Amino acid sequence: MKLKVTKLEKAAILPKYVHSDDSGLDLSAIEDLEIPPGESQLVPTGIAIELPPNTEAQIRPRSGLALKHQITVLNTPGTVDEGYRGEIGVILINHGKNSFKVTRGMKIAQMVIAPVIRVEVEEVDHLSDTTRGSGGFGSTGLTSD
């Protein structure tokens, strides 16, 4: 399966897997910028993609940035639809107490290509019963007991 990528900027870095068994391709920043504490920024990558049929790209945080700097993807996972052909941008948010500098070439997020299942929506008067029912938001408890 092929992911077609166009560099919109000569210095853009193509997405790549670091290890052969990685699920996410690393995405890199194309410019330097700063994200103050509590704020978010759209970080450009300088690339556009053409996804394989019936797939989406999910933009996800990098665990190292989250753990060490409290930087994460704001709308995680960000969804890139199959038909989108514009620049891939990553919305990063700084949950930390210090300003964070994004530098050109820095790995800022990972992109996972996933299958998409399209459904036909059917309106019904009643849904089938389950043991869980409408219980949500903590209804299963906090411990495994």
From Swiss-Prot:
Its EC number is 3.6.1.23. It catalyses: dUTP + H2O = dUMP + diphosphate + H(+). InterPro entries: dUTPase, dUTPase-like, dUTPase-like_sf, dUTPase_trimeric. The keyword DNA repair does not apply. Keywords: Hydrolase, Magnesium, Metal-binding, Nucleotide metabolism. GO terms for biological process: dUMP biosynthetic process; dUTP catabolic process. It comes from the Bacteria. Substrate binds at residues 62-64, 75, 79-81. Pfam families: dUTPase. Pathway: Pyrimidine metabolism; dUMP biosynthesis; dUMP from dCTP (dUTP route): step 2/2. Its cofactor is Mg(2+). GO terms for molecular function: dUTP diphosphatase activity; magnesium ion binding. This enzyme is involved in nucleotide metabolism: it produces dUMP, the immediate precursor of thymidine nucleotides and it decreases the intracellular concentration of dUTP so that uracil cannot be incorporated into DNA. Belongs to the dUTPase family. This is Deoxyuridine 5'-triphosphate nucleotidohydrolase.
